[in-house]
Structure formats: structure tokens, C-alpha cells
């Protein structure tokens, strides 16, 4: 199934709890491979594995903020890295989308970054 989101319509799918398994960038297309895309049809929740594609994406304008813990209370610190650096350094990690936001020409995913043997931390991806 191919779905093209036109950003002016209601959001038909949810990525909440989706886990990004792989990120690829080729020919100005950024592709996030996720384990599940959720859809509500007639009150029923359905899920499908799939890909989220951003065509004509300038990867130099994409960033990831990685924090030292899951955010919610207290002090925290973190770092900002380019999406390309994230793709290079976090190949064995998994990013679970908790909140998705669509703002004009920007998409924001906030969630948990999971690495083997470590506690999850909050990360924010700007596309």
C-alpha cells in the first residue's frame, strides 16, 4: 500500500509506539522503516509494518537531540547531532516514537532511544 500524506488533510495513521528499525537516505528521499503503522478503521485498531518516506528532503537540515535520561522531571542534559551522524553512530539502536508532530514543512518525532544494555533515553528527531 502506498500512502502520500498531503499535510493539509486529517492524519489517517498514527506512529505512536512505532519503532524505527532503520533509517536510509538516497536520492533526496529519507526513509524510516517502522515495525508498525497504526490505523483506526470503523473503531478497530489495525497495524502494518511500513516505511515513512520524506521526498525532496535536505538531510543537512535534519537534527536529532539525544538526552541523558527519559524526560519528565528534574535536570537533564544532552547533545544535538545531525541526522547523518545519528544514522552513522546509532545503527544498532531503536527509536520508539511517542509523540509525532507535523508543522508546515517540519516533522518532529519525540520518543525513546533504546540501545542494547542501556536504559532508554529521550530523543527528538527533526525532519
Regions flagged by a language model, labelled:
Residues 1-127:
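Surface-exposed, interaction-prone regions used to assemble/regulate multi-protein complexes
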Amino acid at each position: 500500500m502506498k500512502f502520500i500524506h498531503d499535510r493539509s488533510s486529517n492524519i489517517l495513521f498514527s506512529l505512536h509506539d512505532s519503532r524505527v528499525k532503520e533509517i536510509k537516505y538516497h536520492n533526496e528521499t529519507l526513509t524510516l522503516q517502522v515495525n508498525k503503522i497504526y490505523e483506526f478503521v470503523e473503531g478497530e485498531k489495525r497495524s502494518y509494518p511500513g516505511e515513512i518516506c520524506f521526498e525532496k528532503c535536505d538531510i543537512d537540515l535534519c537534527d536529532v537531540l539525544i538526552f541523558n535520561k527519559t524526560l519528565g522531571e528534574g535536570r537533564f542534559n544532552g547533545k544535538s547531532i545531525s541526522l547523518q551522524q545519528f544514522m552513522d553512530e546509532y545503527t544498532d539502536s531503536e527509536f520508539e516514537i511517542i509523540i509525532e508532530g507535523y508543522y508546515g514543512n517540519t516533522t518532529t518525532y519525540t520518543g525513546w532511544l533504546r540501545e542494547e544494555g542501556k536504559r532508554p533515553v529521550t530523543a527528538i528527531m527533526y525532519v
